[in-house]
Amino acid sequence: MVLVVLVIVAAGGFALHSGLDFFEDISGADASEERSLYRSANLEPALAALREEVGPRMRVDLKIEQRSLKANASVPERGDLLVVVTADGDVVDTSTGAGAEDAPRLRAVSADAVEKIADAVVRRADIALEDIAYFSMDTSKRPAWNVYLDGGGVWAAGLDGSDLRRSL
């Protein structure tokens, strides 16, 4: 009972923070390096599908997992959306989201920067790519990425991959 309550409280805390944890990594697929969205060749089709769904100039708050991409976006005429895209570039869900008025525009997100950050975290933390739980956009100050590790710990970097540092 206590464990269940702790899990619910922990999960709820992040969901309230970002609104992007509503959907789990929906693919259920193995997070192998060659299929990981932390690789630019795999992330770019997912970003392209997202651009097509919401437009490249829309502001987005992103969460990138090994096999899925989730975005809160504020889209004129459609309102605030939560869009989920698989690693194959398929839009699998679009529902009401939390909005992203203070987030960067989608065109500012670089698949190459995500791969650069992932490679640097793997090297500096001495982990495997599969040990990265997810990337989450931090829009509280200047746009940046927070990189959460499965075993605990958080790394932070600029949206372009600069200034990588251990955060927690």
Which role does the model predict for each range below?
Residues 1-26:
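Hydrophobic single-pass membrane-targeting/anchoring helices
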Residues 19-34, 88-104:
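Acidic/histidine-rich, surface-exposed loop or edge segments in extracytoplasmic proteins
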Residues 19-81:
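Extracytoplasmic low-complexity, Pro/Thr/Ser/Ala/Gly-rich segments
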Residues 49-53, 72, 81-86, 103-106, ...:
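Aromatic-residue detector
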Residues 62, 75-99, 145-168:
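Extended intrinsically disordered, low-complexity coil regions enriched in Ser, Thr, Gly, Ala
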Residues 104-158:
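Extracytosolic low-complexity repeat regions of secreted or lipid-anchored proteins
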